[in-house]
Amino acid sequence: MPEPGGHPVVWDACAQIVAARLMPSFHTRRVVCHPPKAMFDLVADVERYPEFVPLCEALEIRSRTPESDGAEVITATMTAGYGLIRESFTSRVRLDHAAARILVSYVDGPFRTLENHWSFLPHPRGCEVDFFIQYEFRSRTLQMLVGALFDGAVRRFSDAFEIRADRVYGRPTAKVNIGTPLRCTSPGDMKLPRR
């Protein structure tokens, strides 16, 4: 017969499920008219984030480490700010070129949890970009002060990267007919700028 109050493992699992549902998160999947490698490289270029990522004021690379499977791990500290509020946090960014995935895990800062991932899949019109982020601030006060602002910025992330891609790689030529979706002429025709 179970103890009154239930089994601790079951309660822990229930608490994790409830916390996951209450934790702010955002997921989007969209097709962009740029090749997967171009989009991967754009998101992987974390040093440029202060130029276009919402709320990102500064970013400092702490380390770069190649892994045996060909992936690269970057540890970076980002300073995010709005008005008089500034917070810095450190993340571990795993760039998996072979799988066309970028995984970001939280190391230190004002969050209890912060994780996100990107994946870049070939698509007839360019690339299908999948972006997911989940976060929770440690401080309820900070959550109340900047939670809605941060949530709004997170929802603009994928837009910011798509706009940046158009600026860096050029806006792809598209055929638009009334009543039909936007179509790139051909992902193979898109040229990447020389570095």
PLM region spans:
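Hydrophobic-ligand binding "helix-grip"
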Residues: P50-P54, A58-E67, T79-D130, Q134-E136, ...
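Short, well-structured hydrophobic secondary-structure segments
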Residues: I74-M78
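A conserved amphipathic terminal alpha-helix motif
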Residues: F137, T141-C184
